[in-house]
Amino acid sequence: MAPGSVSSVSSSSFPSRDTSPSGSCGLPGADKPGPSCRRIQAGQRNPTMLHMVLEALKAREARQGTSVVAIKVYIQHKYPTVDTTRFKYLLKQALETGVRRGLLTRPAHSKAKGATGSFKLVPKPKTKKACAPKAGRGAAGAKETGSKKSGLLKKDQVGKATMEKGQKRRAYPCKAATLEMAPKKAKAKPKEVRKAPLKQDKAAGAPLTANGGQKVKRSGSRQEANAHGKTKGEKSKPLASKVQNSVASLAKRKMADMAHTVTVVQGAETVQETKVPTPSQDIGHKVQPIPRVRKAKTPENTQA
């Protein structure tokens, strides 16, 4: 086939392109000049009516609220493409839903109902920001120095940094804990005092007193008694001789007292004689009897 025939077939097989003006859409009556079909189909979407009402209240925020008329004027001025036929109904529904959800309120002492009166936004509750824990000055300084000199630290500096971290992580004991532990250590268990068995004084035989089994103090202590006993034994020997001498002197005195004078008349002369009685048994010294000695009899024959 000739090359010319191919071109003729291809041109006849495919339909010719539409040479209609840009404004036409292939619909009847589309030849009229006007906006393109794409613009009409896509359109400009408006936000919801509730969103527009909230935006109007934020823009015209007042202390006593914003009236419904002011809300309408704001929406129509900013969104001119809103459907005017349904605008009143949509606005009433948006105000009711906003009040039901707690987004809108009426000002105090307001008696209006429906899509009348004025509205205002509900104030949001103020939330207190949680205070972040303040980092210590030493920790912040250590972080800054560590970030700056991380690549330039030597072995000695690395060792120091690890020591600093260990010291910071160390938990220091609280003062209250130390104060509470101190009296516990100071307290010591009292030693059990064993009561000594009660003993009576054998020498005196006196009963014990009520105060802890202590004996009643006497005039002479045991030490004095012991000292007296020692001195008594030492002085007993010279005293024995003195006692004997005193007994002898007493015997002589008694003998002298018992002696009486007897007057004897001998002629013209009178003689006084003193008779001394023999010592009796009640005198201190007893008279020992003289032993009798038998005389040996000699026979007469022997004498001769």
UniProtKB/Swiss-Prot annotation:
Record's keyword annotation contains RNA-binding: no
Annotated GO biological process: epigenetic regulation of gene expression; meiotic cell cycle; nucleosome assembly
UniProt-annotated location(s): Cytoplasm; Nucleus; Chromosome
Biased composition (Polar residues): 270-281
Primary localization: cytoplasm
Compositionally biased residues, Low complexity: 1-24, 132-144
Biased composition (Basic and acidic residues): 153-166, 189-202, 225-237
Residue intervals of the H15 domain: 45-123
Signal peptide, first to last residue: none
Record keywords: Chromosome, Cytoplasm, DNA-binding, Meiosis, Nucleus
Role: May play a key role in the control of gene expression during oogenesis and early embryogenesis, presumably through the perturbation of chromatin structure. Essential for meiotic maturation of germinal vesicle-stage oocytes. The somatic type linker histone H1c is rapidly replaced by H1oo in a donor nucleus transplanted into an oocyte. The greater mobility of H1oo as compared to H1c may contribute to this rapid replacement and increased instability of the embryonic chromatin structure. The rapid replacement of H1c with H1oo may play an important role in nuclear remodeling.
Protein's UniProt name: Histone H1.8
GN (gene name): H1.8
